[in-house]
C-alpha cells in the first residue's frame, strides 16, 4: 500500500502472561476517553487516555477470556475462565476507586486494585467459552462433552441474582474436542470461539456498542444473500460463530426462541456459511465500496453507514471475504473469495474504510479491500457493485506484533487511529495515514520537530529490538544446522565401518586398584576421535554395565546400570577416559561375567529443540503452530563396542600385585576393630576358622576340564603365539585380556595359580593328551585345559570363560573351511547317550531335594556334585 505511514505513541506498560494465548486472550476496548484492557491474566485495567493515568484494576478469580462493553447501559461484561460471566457497573467505578484509595493509602501500586465480588457473577457456568451481549439479550457459547451449545438469555444487569431463570432458547452446534486436565479444573482450550452479532439495515442499530465490539450492520443485499429470506422478513439479528475447527456458522436470533426443555433443531436453526479449515480468529465487517452519498461528498464524517463486506480470518492467515455482486445474468449473488495472508495471525481488526489490520509475531500489516479489479459504477442499484480484489497485498506498518487491536474513531486530521497492546505488554496508539500518496515537504516548527525526533527514536528502538530477536534466532538455527551436519558426518563415518578400524572408537580395559581400603576391579573406557569431525553439543557417551545373576540364585536376574557422560568438545585427535568400578560389592561378591556396552547418543531435542525454542519467552505462544517434530527416540544412537569381562580377566597373580610387599587383599567390607583384635590375639600356629579356610581344608577342590584338538589350536594360534610350546601358547591365549598377563609372558608356563576376586585360588593347567577310540585313523592329539578351585562358583565362572573363548575360536576356524577327521559315530552316540542319562539323574535329584529334609539332602547334594563332575569332564574333543 503506497504511502502508508504511522505514528506511534506509547501510553503505558502492562505485564503480559507467559502462557498460551488461547488460555487467556488479550483484549482492548475503548469508549470515549476510557480504555478497558486485559492481558490474558486475571486483571482488567481501566486506563484514562486523556489523563494518561491508570484509574483502576479489577481482579477476577481466574483468567479473563473476553470483554464486552454495553455503553448505553454503562455496563462492562467480563468472561472469566472456568467461572462465568461478570457484570460491572461503570457508574460505580469512581466510587469504588475512591474507596479503595482511602483503604490502601500506603499500598505499593499507585492505582487501586478492586477484587471483584463473587456476587458480580451474573451467569455462573464453567463451560462458557464466548459470549456477546445485546441491548436486552445475552448470547453464550459453551463447550459440552461432545458439542458446542449456544444459549440465549435475558440480559442480566449488575447487582442482579444469577440467571438460571432467564434462558430463552438453546441450540447445539458442531462436534468439539473437550480440553484435558483434571475434572476440578480442566485445561483451557487452545483457541476460543468467536461470536458476533449482525443486524439488518432496517432494524434497531446497536448504538450502545463501541466500534470493534462484535456488533455491526450489513447492507440489505448482503444480509439477505447470507442469511436467507426468514432473517430478512423477521428483521432479526443474526449470531455469527467462528469455531476452533474452522467452521463459520450462523443462527437467526428470533428463531432461537424455544422452550427450556426442547432445544432447537440444529438442522433448521444452524446454517454453515463456510469452513476455513483452521481456527477462526476474527470476524468483522467493512465498507469495500464507497457509498453514493460519500462519493458525492454528501455523507458527513462519522455518520453511520452500513457495511457491504463480511471478513473472517483464520489462525494461519487464511482470509475469507464475502460481498454481494452482480452475476453475468444480472442477478445479485454472494461473491466469496479466499486469500492467504502471512501467519500465524494473533489478532485482527477492520475499519469502515475497507482496511483489515492483522498482527503476526513479527509485524503489524494492513490490507485494502477497496482496491478492486473493476472501477466503481454508481449506476448499479443497491450499492452492490463491482467485485472483490483478486489478490491482497499486505503492507507493513513497521510496528512490532500486537496481541490485541481496536480501531477507534477517525482522528480530526483524517487518519485512522489504532489502539494496540504489543507483545511486550505496552499499550500504544498508532495514527495511520493510509491515503497519503507521497510525502509533501513542509516547514516544521521547533516543537513539532522535537516530537518527530522522539517518534523516530522510538521507531528505531522498536526496529532494533526486532532485529536483535531475529538475529539471535538466526544464529541459533545456524548453530543447530552446523551441529546436525557434523552429526550426519559422524553417523556416516561410523556406520560405513561396522567392523574393523573405526574413525571414532571406544576401547575397554580392566585393572585392579585400591579404593577405600578395598581391592576394586576398575573398567576404563577410552573414547578416541581419529576422524576429522568434532563431537560437540548434543553428544553423550553411554556405558551400560550388565551383571549376571548369582550362581547360587537360580531364579535371580542380573542388574543393569547405564552411565551417561556428556562429550564436550572432543576434537580430532583427542581422547576421553572414563573409569568405572565394577566390584566387588561391600559383601565381597562380584557376579561374573559382566557385559559392558558403549554407544554414542546424539540428542536431537537438545540441539534442534534449543534452536526452535523462542529466544524471548513472550514469543512462545505464537510458535506453537510449529511444534518440534522429532522421532520417538528423540535422538540418534551409534553403537561403538561391546565387551564381556569374565573370570579369566579378573584373576590376579601374586607376582603382579600392585604393591609388591603384600599379596592381593581379599575384597569385602573392612574388618571391624573387634575382629581385628581377636585375629591378632590368636595363638601362633593355630589354624584359621573362617568358612573359606574350612572349605579349602576339608573339601576337595572342584575341577572341570575341556579338550581341544591340537591341530585346531595350532591353526588358530600360529600367528600370535608362534615359537612357543603349544601348552604355553594356549595359556597365553586364555589370559591375553588379563591386565597381569606379563607374569605368563615372562616365562614358559603350562600351569598357573591365580586369585579370584573373593580371594580363593583358581588353578589353570594345560597339558597334551592323546584321545583314543574316537577316530579309526588312530589317536587324536589334543590339549586338555583343566580348571581347579576350592570354590565351586569360581570354578564354574572360569570354566564358562574358557568355553566362551573356544566357541569363538571354533566359529572363526569353521569360517575358514577347516574340516575335522573321520570319527567313529557309534562311539559318539554312546557318549551322547551316557550324557543324556546323567542329565536325567540330575533332574531327578534336583526334584528330590525339594521334598527331603536337611539330613537326607546332604547325601543327595553329594550325588549331584559327583554327577556334575562327570559332566564337566567329558570324553569328547573339540575338533
From Swiss-Prot:
Task: Give the UniProt keywords, A-Z.
Answer: DNA damage, DNA repair, DNA-binding, Nucleus
Provide the primary localization.
nucleus
Please provide one cellular component term from the Gene Ontology annotations of this protein: Fanconi anaemia nuclear complex
GO molecular function terms listed in the Swiss-Prot or TrEMBL record: DNA binding
Source domain of life is Eukaryota
Do you know which Pfam families this protein is assigned to?
FANCAA
Location of the protein in the cell: Nucleus
Q: Which residues form a coiled coil?
A: none
Please give the biological process terms from Gene Ontology that the record holds. Answer: interstrand cross-link repair
Q: How does it assemble?
A: Belongs to the multisubunit FA complex composed of FANCA, FANCB, FANCC, FANCE, FANCF, FANCG, FANCL/PHF9, FANCM, FAAP24 and FAAP100. Forms a subcomplex with FANCB and FANCL.
Task of the protein: Plays a role in Fanconi anemia-associated DNA damage response network. Regulates FANCD2 monoubiquitination and the stability of the FA core complex. Induces chromosomal instability as well as hypersensitivity to DNA cross-linking agents, when repressed.
> What is the protein's given name?
Fanconi anemia core complex-associated protein 100
Q: What gene is this protein translated from? A: Faap100
